[in-house]
Amino acid sequence: MSDSGDAQPQDGGNSSSSRGKSPSVGNRVTVVLGAQWGDEGKGKVVDLLAQDADMVCRCQGGNNAGHTVVVDSVEYDFHLLPSGIINPKVTAFIGNGVVIHLPGLFEEAEKNVRKGKGLEGWESRLIISDRAHIVFDFHQAVDGVQEQERQQQAGKNLGTTKKGIGPVYSAKAARSGLRICDLLADFQEFSERFKHLASQYKSMYPSLEIDVDGELEKLKSYVDRIKPMVRDGVFFMYEALHGDPKRILVEGANAALLDIDFGTYPFVTSSNCTVGGVCTGLGMPPQNVGEVYGVVKAYTTRVGIGAFPTEQSNETGELLQTRGKEVGVTTGRKRRCGWLDLVLIKYAHMINGFTALALTKLDILDVLPEIKVGVAYKVNGETIPHFPANQEVLQKVEVEYETLPGWSTDTSAVRTFEELPENAKKYVCFIEDRLGVPVKWIGVGKSRESMIQLF
């Protein structure tokens, strides 16, 4: 104590050495997001970036997503696992925003292990957030029943993947969901809550058949297998961001136009697949978001129903579908195809703030004599400056196109921008100029080598 009886700091009261200084930001994450309706080739971009990454994360969605990665001529399919796990040096993290169907997780891993060496030792490389919600078999059954009801009542369904994603996110919002941390705590308490949730669904859908004891038995069998993988996700992420320098990659599932808030509602998924979902789905602040790469297919595709302004229900659409082998990885459904829509991508950019783009499947356009690009929407003859929220309005928009000359040259063997045909270069530059975002990669084939890097 000082003589005055008042212990005063020597610097006149400014005792905090950190006051007025911003705390250090730490490592920044690189984010890869779909800029259209999904199936843009995000897995390929992630696979490319994962070669140098230390950590690859999933922040939202469940096994409704489908990513295909080709390594050493082996085609691996990922739905729930971050596809970067294919790199043996990578730690894969499934964040709290992801919903996990445990049988699906292990089936997916085992299926890929049988295909090739890429996934050997995956269990020691996977970390799961304790706050992630669990998808139960009955969520998947409910998904199917809800689709049937929608079909009967309105004559149209949402085209869900029937993986239980909507029902589990609904349960999460209604605060009746169960999480990984609940499964690993008191199993008796977990069982009670599980039974209560099952009975709620039974009362809503009397035709629903739920094998409560069978499913609980199955869930109990996963406890010891997943326990070593589970961590407090927030603490784990904080340590990763503020520890040694690390290259951290976030692999977005689904895409901007499927986002629950910003997508073509109601024909959307049940999570935020735009950049905001990265922070809420991993438990990290926005200042740790670094590069945000938007993945754009050189034309547009969509699975299921919903407005699609540039859709080509004609020979062009069929050509794109056939040449692009446009069939869903998760559903096996044929994708609807149409011209590139820059109104839609500009909208996705407004939300996500893309720092660069990956333009995929350019080679699919190789045979077209001319290529159209949607550049504006008109409603009642008036150009509108925004992307309509209302589905009925979006159904009615008239698309204004710019027609560009094709290049009628096979680009699949091209490995540098300079080697591309002149008109293909012009197509890329046209996209960059209209969006004000640089194209960093151009995809001209399935393999890793067929991604041309521009800078």
UniProtKB/Swiss-Prot annotation:
It is an enzyme of class 6 (ligase). Inhibited competitively by AMP and IMP and non-competitively by fructose 1,6-bisphosphate. IMP binds at D39, E40, G41, K42, N64, A65, G66, H67, T161, R175, N254, T269, R333. One of its GO terms (biological process) is 'de novo' AMP biosynthetic process. It catalyses: IMP + L-aspartate + GTP = N(6)-(1,2-dicarboxyethyl)-AMP + GDP + phosphate + 2 H(+). Its EC number is 6.3.4.4. GO terms for molecular function: adenylosuccinate synthase activity; GTP binding; magnesium ion binding. SMART domains: Adenylsucc_synt (SM00788). Binds 1 Mg(2+) ion per subunit. Substrate binds at D39, V329, T330, T331, G332, R333, K334, R335. It comes from the Eukaryota. Coiled coil: none annotated. Mg(2+) binds at D39, G66. Belongs to the adenylosuccinate synthetase family. PANTHER family: ADENYLOSUCCINATE SYNTHETASE, ADENYLOSUCCINATE SYNTHETASE ISOZYME 2. Homodimer. This is Adenylosuccinate synthetase isozyme 2. It comes from Danio rerio (Zebrafish).
